[in-house]
Swiss-Prot record:
Entry superkingdom: Bacteria
Species: Cupriavidus necator (strain ATCC 17699 / DSM 428 / KCTC 22496 / NCIMB 10442 / H16 / Stanier 337) (Ralstonia eutropha)
Family: Belongs to the four-carbon acid sugar kinase family.
Pfam families recorded: NBD_C (PF17042), SBD_N (PF07005)
EC class name: transferase
Known catalytic reactions: D-threonate + ATP = 4-O-phospho-D-threonate + ADP + H(+)
The protein, known as: D-threonate kinase
Disruption-associated phenotype: Deletion mutant is unable to use D-threonate as a carbon source.
InterPro entries given in the database record: 4-carb_acid_sugar_kinase_N, 4-carb_acid_sugar_kinase_N_sf, NBD_C, NBD_C_sf
Function: Catalyzes the ATP-dependent phosphorylation of D-threonate to D-threonate 4-phosphate. Can also phosphorylate 4-hydroxy-L-threonine, with lower efficiency.
Binding residues annotated for substrate, in chain numbering: D9, R53, K81, I82, D83, S84
Lineage: Bacteria, Pseudomonadati, Pseudomonadota, Betaproteobacteria, Burkholderiales
Keyword terms of this UniProt record: ATP-binding, Carbohydrate metabolism, Kinase, Nucleotide-binding, Transferase
Keyword field contains DNA damage: no
Length: 415
């Protein structure tokens, strides 16, 4: 059994695929069609980051279809990874994939991170998603009503309420199959606990109608748990070569800010906050060279470093990709001296890896829910690096510190 995961950002792709890696699957996350050093033909699970979150809906849908064809979607089980806080073009992408892949089993809940679904609407730590800081930061409007959002994209959708999800395997399977025969194209599933997701996974894994799954890391873990892969237990992590760890915080969520503060306080590592105005102007800004030299000097000396983006009155959520790309270019000379990267915010992680010419990640294990640990391919003249990625609004307050610990506890001494 092989899987194709299509995600709209890098941290989501890794977070979704880690469950399979933990079940022993050979799992690769790709940033490009043919990444150097990664043999996709030998992978049990290929997770494609199509980087479509900020695209126009039509362009995002086309990018997903391209990934489906390129990833041999017809011969693999498909998991369409979406953001558990419904950012991006998930509804348009799901509607585009449905004619090819079948009935959409939609369950974005991720209880381990406080994301749940009730009455077909999303909640974050018990609060309606539309009332959360996450939606305010992204300037999103309306209600987080999954059925309505799918219907707005022309997909006939219906709700599978919690009492049906908990009615038992046979009832759940028969209900979903019956809805498909009635012409329903998407089933939106309530879920409050990991047991609810496990029930959905078990009931839908053997449906007698074509189907694919639409969700976050929560449902992906539930689907991966009973899978048997030849690799068995995940391979132990080899000790990385000696060298510093660079932590990039490109997300401006309050959660990421608290995580960065925790990392700084517990490690005492050097930190740098880069004003957005420097990143907007790039190398032409008067302070660019000084900031770049500060980053490079610290990492060249073998010291770990925390770099984050500041905020100002001109902040616009839509400029995230631009700021992330500039942060990557600012950090690139120093990145060459690192052996580890921690990146919070999928756009930040992708920008840094792309700038460094890294097109794939081999997933290893999970630091905590939503924080996977990976290795980059070893290429001629380019040593492998350890990478931890995290969505901006995910994780415990100590998430970055836990990621740093996971990297440094086995770090080999510098030569």
């Amino acid at each position: 059994m092989s899987w194709l995961i299509i995600a709209d950002d890098l941290s989501g792709a890794a977070d979704c695929a880690i469950g399979y890696a933990m079940s022993g699957a050979r799992t690769v996350v790709t940033l490009e069609a043919a990444p150097a050093g990664a043999d996709l033909s030998q992978a049990d699970v290929v997770a494609c980051d199509v980087d479509s979150r900020r695209m126009a809906p039509q362009e995002a849908a086309a990018r997903n279809l391209e990934a489906w064809h390129r990833g041999q979607g017809a011969s693999r089980r498909l998991y369409k990874k979406i953001d558990s806080t419904l950012r991006g073009n998930w509804a348009a992408e799901t509607a585009a994939l449905a004619p090819l892949a079948g009935l959409a089993i939609v369950a974005p809940a991720f209880p381990a991170t406080g994301r749940t679904t009730a009455g077909g609407c999303m909640f974050v730590n018990g609060q309606p998603l539309e009332d959360s800081d996450i939606w305010r930061l992204e300037a999103l409007t309306g209600r987080a009503d999954l059925v309505a959002l799918l219907a707005a994209r022309g997909l006939r959708a219906t709700l599978l309420p919690l009492d049906t999800v908990r009615a038992g395997d046979a009832t759940l399977r028969l209900t979903i199959a019956g809805l498909a025969r009635e012409g329903v194209r998407a089933v939106v599933c309530d879920a409050q606990t990991e047991q609810d997701l496990a029930a959905l996974a078990a009931a839908t894994a053997q449906l007698d109608v074509p189907a694919f799954w639409v969700g976050s890391g929560g449902l992906a873990r539930a689907l991966a748990a009973p899978c048997l892969f030849e690799g068995g237990a995940p391979q132990p992590l080899p000790a990385p070569e000696g060298g510093p760890v660079l932590t990039l915080v490109g997300s401006l969520s309050g959660i990421s800010g608290r995580q960065a503060a925790c990392l700084r306080e517990r490690t005492g590592m050097q930190s740098l906050v880069v004003p957005p105005r420097i990143l907007r102007e790039g190398a032409g800004h008067a302070d660019w060279d000084a900031a770049q030299q500060s980053i490079t000097g610290c990492l060249r000396a073998g010291r770990d470093l925390l770099v984050s983006i500041g905020r100002d009155d001109a902040f616009d959520p839509g400029e995230g990709p631009r700021l992330s790309a500039a942060l990557a270019q600012l950090s690139l000379p120093g990145f060459q001296h690192t052996r580890g990267l921690i990146a919070t915010g999928g756009e930040t992680a992708r920008a840094m890896l792309s700038a460094a010419g890294i097109g794939a990640l081999m997933l290893r294990r999970e630091v905590e829910p939503g924080v996977p640990l990976s290795d980059t391919p070893a290429l001629p003249g380019v040593p492998a690096r350890r990478v931890a990625t995290k969505a901006g609004a995910f994780g415990s307050e100590a998430a970055l510190w836990h990621a740093w610990q996971a990297m440094t506890e086995s770090r080999a001494p510098s030569a």
